Amino acid sequence: MLALKPVVSGYDPADATASDPARILSALDLPLDDAHLEAISPWRFRAALAPGIAARLEGRALGVDAIAAFVRETFERSSAGVDAGFVEGVGGLLSPIAEDATNVELIRALGLGVILVAGTYLGAIGHALATIDAARLHGIPLAALVVNESEAGVMAPQDVAAELARFRPELRGVPLPRGDAGEAATRERLDPMVEALFAGLPEG
């Protein structure tokens, strides 16, 4: 499996273990070092701001074409030994990911389907429905929906998934409860979710 998060804001190199790239590397059983960080997240910015703004503060360029090229080249190099690939964006569907583009433009450039991650906080159902409709308006295919239990959630993830299904029954919802019961228990909980996700992904 290959997972990339090309662009990261709010990255503190002095506390890299708390970053999103560190979590991805840990999930892939890869070491947290400069080479692996660069391989999955080449654009890392200190300021916790929209990436285009954070890039300008550091005097760096950040264009959607460069991000898309990085993803394509990485997938091409790794295709022989990879059974699945994931690209994590930043923020929501319409959040800026570069100086000249939102996640929408990157998704279009790559031709990827989207796995939408919703929460269980107050307002999460409305946010998810708005994102679903925005994706439709932009012609972006939603392959699956994960309902990830928020730290201060007000509903169980399975209940949020069921409620979303009342409004958008065509979209698969997979609940993911919180928990820290150790690696074995976590994998046992995640395996059915991953299987359900791939069951809903289009072939090819």
Language-model-detected regions and their locations in the chain:
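P-loop NTP-binding module
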Residues: 72-89, 111-114, 178, 194-204
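Short glycine/serine/threonine-rich phosphate/pyrophosphate-binding segments
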Residues: 93-98, 123-129
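Phosphate-binding/switch loop-helix module in NTP-utilizing enzymes
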Residues: 50-97, 104
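N-terminal phosphate/diphosphate-binding loop that engages ATP/GTP or pyrophosphate donors
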Residues: 1-61, 72-77
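Short internal beta-strands
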Residues: 5, 115-118, 143-149
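Charged helix-capping and loop-helix junction motifs
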Residues: 98-106, 129-132, 157-162
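Inter-motif core of Ras-like GTPase G domains
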Residues: 98-120
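C-terminal lobe/tail of nucleotide-utilizing enzymes
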Residues: 35, 133-204
